[in-house]
């Protein structure tokens, strides 16, 4: 199942004969075999080579041991790409409003994002350390990060994730 907010016990009622039903949350990058796939199963002896091997073709597969995290996972994994798209969209609008060509601004934002993704993929550094490695005290990046902090950007992201969690709970009618 990839239904947001629907618990495995509820889904299982539609398939009473099936013993091994898994709950999935995945994201759009599966279209390019680069997705994040999270699964949970009531059956504890999942044979990953047999039962979920096809999922590995779509991206990285992770098992969670408790279904209680699925609303959070839905918000982060399922909605996560939209967060990044919205950030890029906002940066592009700013670039265009400051005089850059729309096509050119998309190209340089795309390459910046892809390059940044490759750094994340190829290092064990945490996000804070990576951000700090780009941020020179008193520099342009520092000014931008300071502005984001003053506007409580982290709190805005936190509240946005919580709103997505709340929506997932509403979809399952659980409070």
Identify the residue ranges that each predicted region occupies.
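ADP-ribose/adenylate-binding Rossmann-like module
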Residues: 1-6
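Internal alpha-helical scaffold of NAD(P)-dependent oxidoreductase catalytic cores
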Residues: 10, 14-20, 36-72, 83-124
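Active-site glycine-rich loop that binds ribose-phosphate moieties when present
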Residues: 23
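Rossmann-like dinucleotide/flavin-binding elements
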Residues: 30-32
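Alpha-helical membrane segments and immediately flanking helix-loop junctions
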Residues: 76-77
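NAD(P)-dependent Rossmann-like dehydrogenase/reductase catalytic/cofactor-binding core
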Residues: 110-175
């Amino acid at each position: 199942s990839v239904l947001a907010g629907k618990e495995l016990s509820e889904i299982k009622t539609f398939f009473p004969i099936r013993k091994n039903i898994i709950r999935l949350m995945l994201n759009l990058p599966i279209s390019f075999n680069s997705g994040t796939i999270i699964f949970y199963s009531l059956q504890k002896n999942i044979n990953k080579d047999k039962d979920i091997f096809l999922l590995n073709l779509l991206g990285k597969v992770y098992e969670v041991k408790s279904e209680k995290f699925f609303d959070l996972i839905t918000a982060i994994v399922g909605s996560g790409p939209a967060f990044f798209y919205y950030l890029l969209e906002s940066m592009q609008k700013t670039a265009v409003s400051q005089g850059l060509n729309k096509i050119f601004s998309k190209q340089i934002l795309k390459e910046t994002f892809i390059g940044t993704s490759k750094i994340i993929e190829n290092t064990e550094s945490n996000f804070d350390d990576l951000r700090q490695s780009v941020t020179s005290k008193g520099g342009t990046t520092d000014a931008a990060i300071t502005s984001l902090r003053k506007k409580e950007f982290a709190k805005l992201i936190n509240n946005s994730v919580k709103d997505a969690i709340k929506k997932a709970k509403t979809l399952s009618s659980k409070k």
